[in-house]
Amino acid sequence: MKPDITFYRRFQADILAGRKTITIRDDSESHFQPGQRLMVGQYEDGRPFCEIEVIGVTPVMLAQLNAQHAAQENMTLDALRSVIGEIYPQIERLYVISFSLVRALAG
């Protein structure tokens, strides 16, 4: 089964434990809707590992990222800004996708 959204493998444990409850994406992934259930896979190999439900999608400027966003990503604000800069260089307008874990998949 092809995932609807992917995350780097390093984030899998935090998602499954409920420590990571948002993801910050660019315009290409801003189309998700509240209530939508997504199959989640690892970015590296596409292997599905859970299902999440989208709670909301909110636009945010890179400069507006704050400590609350960092806590929801389970990292420091400096680490969050660094990761976002690596993944989305030169992009200022982003989208916060908040989600909850529906179920983990047997692996």
Swiss-Prot record:
Gene3D superfamilies: Hypothetical protein
UniProt keyword annotation of Zinc-finger present: no
Catalytic machinery residues: 20 (proton acceptor), 23 (nucleophile), 73 (proton donor)
Classification via Pfam families: ASCH (PF04266)
Source superkingdom: Bacteria
Domain ASCH: from-to ranges: 6-102
InterPro entries on file: AC4CH, ASCH_domain, PUA-like_sf
First-level EC class: hydrolase
Catalytic activity, EC: 3.5.1.135
Keyword tags: Hydrolase
GO molecular function, one term: hydrolase activity, acting on carbon-nitrogen (but not peptide) bonds, in linear amidines
UniProt keyword annotation of Hydrolase present: yes
Catalysed conversion reaction: N(4)-acetylcytidine + H2O = cytidine + acetate + H(+); N(4)-acetyl-2'-deoxycytidine + H2O = 2'-deoxycytidine + acetate + H(+); N(4)-acetylcytosine + H2O = cytosine + acetate + H(+)
Family statement drawn from the similarity comment of this UniProt entry: Belongs to the N(4)-acetylcytidine amidohydrolase family.
Protein task: Catalyzes the hydrolysis of N(4)-acetylcytidine (ac4C).
Protein name: N(4)-acetylcytidine amidohydrolase
